[in-house]
């Protein structure tokens, strides 16, 4: 899992991966994966690389580890097709050919959408809005019947209180329309 660490008294946060190679008997900390990002998520790619999606104030950053998360590329890249307005989201593998990423669509905390990548995170589709109102943090899972579950904060008006809501839908719902 990814840990966000403030290494100095400054507000700058770095991301590290905490991992186990022995089913949790012992734990290790990776090298620094990013400086200045927050609330990162990781997914294993088909070739064994680890892809990290990193929250920033603008577009989502990403980084790749080629050694199971022990070390990370020196250069951080950004996705042109994922904005992620300084908000947490989730990144999971649906199947061998499909990654899913949940984030608010646009530049504010509303309209949480799920984006699909069919090329291991190189590009993302336009995204399907799941929550067409104020919404923010979300978590995804693939259920045993291969439907997708999403747990998300949402609210009807611009207040500080959110309700937690669970959605369930088939992958075909996401693939049917890009909006």
Give, region by region, the residue ranges found by the protein language model.
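Asp-box/BNR beta-propeller blade signature and adjacent active/binding-site loops
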Residues: 1-179
